[in-house]
C-alpha cells in the first residue's frame, strides 16, 4: 500500500508485506513500514521499521529486492533508517473478494493493512524489462484495491491510494499481490 495526501504530492506512508516461502536467507514474514517515508529516522520517533520473524531474510529482502527497486521504497530517506523489530503475531482476516486485512504485531506495535473495494484478480507473467528490478521474471496474482489504508496502533496513517500504471494495467497504489514468484532467468 502506497499512500499520498494528494495525487501530485509526496508519499505520505508506504508498506510492503511479504510472506516468503523460499529465499537464500530462508523463509518468513516481513512488513516494511514507512510511517513517514520523507524522514531519515525511526523508533522511537516514527515507525520506519521492518517487522519480521526472520531478520536474515528481512535484510536479504532489503538488500536484494527493495534496494534494487527504483522508486519510493529504495529512494525514500526512511529506507536508510529502518530498524528491524521481531514480530510477535502475523495473521489475516476478511476475504479476497471484498475486504482483506493483514495484521502484524510486535512489542508495542500493531499494524493493520486494509484493502477494501477489491477489484477483479489479474494474473501477471512479466519479463525482466517490465519488472522493477530489471533482472527477474515475475509471476503473480494482482488484486487492485480502490480503498486501502494503513493503521498503526489504532491510528490511520494519512493519505489515500492514487492511480498507478503497473505492468501495462491501470490500477491504484493500493494493490495486493498473491502467489508472487520472482525468478532470475
Please tell me what each predicted stretch does.
Residues 1-185:
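Targeting-peptide/extracellular-domain and disordered-appendage signature
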